[in-house]
């Protein structure tokens, strides 16, 4: 195995670990999920460019009679990128003591202010940071509001 193959295996393993954490583990952390809200997908064009570049690498590897394992690893990397960007749904998980946003748990005590922008983006101000949450359906903003009021 070359250094390139090792790097590809590490990248694929990290992407797979992230996908497993996001899909199965995060739901079970920090207690029962009280509300799950699907979010808008972001960076689709970036992933399409990345998959195109990986496709160029696959073509280059096949045309130069490169190692077959490298080709399979590049194909696997392209499939993982496709899954993470187009199949997996980003979500906002509300728990009893906080919520998961971008796979990071944020306790409710860190929230300093909440606002709703004109274009339907929920803005949550934390101590040092501002979260911009874009939901897929505007009705979900009402669910979030009701959940936050009921649990304060």
From Swiss-Prot:
The chain crosses the membrane at residues 6-26, 45-65, 67-87. The keyword Cytoplasm does not apply. The keyword Secreted does not apply. Keywords: Cell inner membrane, Cell membrane, Membrane, Transmembrane, Transmembrane helix. It is a multi-pass membrane protein. One of its GO terms (cellular component) is plasma membrane. It is found in: Cell inner membrane. It comes from the Bacteria. Pfam families: DUF986. Belongs to the UPF0266 family. This is UPF0266 membrane protein ECA2388. It comes from Pectobacterium atrosepticum (strain SCRI 1043 / ATCC BAA-672). The lineage of its organism: Bacteria, Pseudomonadati, Pseudomonadota, Gammaproteobacteria, Enterobacterales.
């Amino acid at each position: 195995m070359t250094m390139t193959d090792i790097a590809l295996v590490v990248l694929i393993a990290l992407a797979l670990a992230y996908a497993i954490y996001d899909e199965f583990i995060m739901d079970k952390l920090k207690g029962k999920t009280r509300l799950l809200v699907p979010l808008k997908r972001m960076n689709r064009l970036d992933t399409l460019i990345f998959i195109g570049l990986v496709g160029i690498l696959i073509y280059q590897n096949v045309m130069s009679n490169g190692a077959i394992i490298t080709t399979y690893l590049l194909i696997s990397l392209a499939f993982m990128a496709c899954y993470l960007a187009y199949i997996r749904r980003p979500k906002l998980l509300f728990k009893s003591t906080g919520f998961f946003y971008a796979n990071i748990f944020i306790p409710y005590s860190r929230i300093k202010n909440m606002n709703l922008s004109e274009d339907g983006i929920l803005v949550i101000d934390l101590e040092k940071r501002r979260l911009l949450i874009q939901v897929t359906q505007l009705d979900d903003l009402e669910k979030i509001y009701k959940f936050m009021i009921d649990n304060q």
